[in-house]
Each structure stands twice: as structure tokens, then as C-alpha cells.
Amino acid sequence: VAELAAFAKERGILFHTDAVQAAGHIPIDVRSLPVDALSLSGHKLYGPKGIGVLYLRRGTAIAPLIEGGAQERELRAGTENVPGIVGLGCAAELAAAELPEEMRRLAGLRDALMDGLLTIDGAWINGSRTQRLPGNLSFGIAGLDAESLLIRLDLAGFAVSAGSACSAGSLEPSQVLTAMGQPPAQAGSAIRVTLGRFTTADETAAFLAAVRSIAGTRKDK
């Protein structure tokens, strides 16, 4: 992101980054990150739903979202969600205080889960093993499409995803994975797993066992 932002800045291009998935999970420092704007969402770091943040670097001008009042520096009229703002602030403080330890814990669970998944015949990991969020992984298994694996894991009690909430309902393979060079068949088989603050080693072991059991039912294995 820093390299892209610097590239844009050299050319006079305004640069915004969506940090919704990053906030509370990896360090974010807008003093060293050369972005003009950054957004995040409270519920992604265990704060209240319905509250978020838009950071604008000093001197960055944008048009008002809602006119008619002076709230939020005249960018969005209407009474502010004060309880939500306070809740988000508390969540951010807690996340920052626990961040180094939680990053290590989640990365350990993630790496163990990736290693286990790769022992399943036909399994692969999408993306880098290390250049990713500590609690994030994306995988696929040959002979299992994402939808069927998603349903069977749901029946087994595991909530995973075949894409982002922004692409919910789309039957097309992930644009991100295809942009990364994944063939359509592999991109269409991808399952995203997110580990969180309350995820335990026992739960990741149970998830791995469920995936292994489902993979064992493939007709073409």
C-alpha cells in the first residue's frame, strides 16, 4: 500500500485505502503511510456495528456526503452516533494494547492450519504464506467447488466465506484471485477463513478434521 500510495502521490493522484480488514489486526500508522484517506469499520475490531472512521490527511478536500449541518466538519450532516464513537474508541484502545501478542497467537494458529490443509491431497493455499493478515487464509481443494464446501462446513458448524461481503451473491470467481493469476477453476474453489480473538487451537483442529473428512468424499480423489 505504501508503494502504491507513493506512486500515486508522485503523479498528483489522490489515494484512499480501505483498511477495514487491517484495523485492529496489524499496525496502522497514517504518519508513515503516505495515504490521503483511509477508512475502517468498528465491528471489524470488535467495536459496535454501524460506526466507522474516515481519516483525511490535512489539506485533503472532499465534497460533503450529506449537506445541511456543521457536524463532522460539514462533511456529513446529522447528529453523531456518540455511543458508537465511544465504543469504537474503546475497541481501538484494547486492540492496540493487545496487538503484538494477538498477532503472534493468530499467526501461529494460521500457520498450523495452513500446514494441516496442505497435507490434504489436492489442497493449495491462495497467496503468500507470510505476507497476509495474521488471522487470514484462503485455500481450495481440487474436486471441491467453493459452494459445496461452504455448505458442508456450515452444516458442520463452521462459518467461512467464499468471498468478501461486497461480492455476496456473485457467481463469478473472485476478481482478486483472478488478478493474482489464479485460473478460474481455482479462483472459483477458494474458501476464505478468518481467525479471531476468540478462536482456539481446538477449534482450528476441529475445522481441519472437518475439511479432511469432506475432502475424503470426493468422487475423483
Where are these regions (language model features)?
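Pyridoxal 5′-phosphate
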Residues: 1-221
